[in-house]
Amino acid sequence: MSIKILSFIFGTLMPISAFAALPYVGLYQTIDDETNTPKSIVQLYEYQDGDNTELAGRIVALYDANGVISETLENPTRVAEKVKNTPKMVGLDIIWDMAWDADDKEFSKGKIMDPKSGKIYSSVIWQDATDSLNVRGKIGPFGRTQKWNVMQATDLPDILQNIDTGDWAPTVRK
């Protein structure tokens, strides 16, 4: 009888913990370092890599020079010219292999790609404030940190409100 009870408990609790959302999953607005204007919207999403649940990030929208969303997953046009196979910018995975470090409350050991240059860097992601996320790309001790703004889906066009990331896995273009 006790084996049946334990089986029931583990059988019902395991799926809940297995599908618990990783921190920071959601939509973020990136800001151009030089012009301080909105550049893109990135969807951070979780995916399975073997037995590990990891974090990745995909560009889901781009802004024009006036700060208006000009491209989404429905209408990508601009290409990442310096990225292998010149993919569209919208739909491009720019973050992958990010592993959660519960002690440091950050994601690390992953990669981030600059879609303009095609260069890939080590990355760390953490949060100091609830309205933004720190995203750092680095080579050794040298790097740059950007603040990404938390976006509410309801403030965005319909196409960005209910993105289904369930079958997403990063496509890495080295």
Residue ranges of each PLM-predicted region?
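Short hydrophobic/aromatic-rich beta-strand segments that constitute the beta-sheet cores
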Residues: 30, 57-59, 108-110, 133-136, ...
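Central antiparallel beta-sheet cores of small beta-barrel/beta-sandwich binding domains
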Residues: 30-32, 37-123
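Amphipathic/hydrophobic helical signal segments and adjacent flexible N-terminal regions
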Residues: 2-7, 20-23, 27, 33-36, ...
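N-terminal signal peptide c-region/cleavage motif recognized by signal peptidases
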Residues: 15-18
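Surface-exposed interaction patches
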Residues: 105-139, 143-147
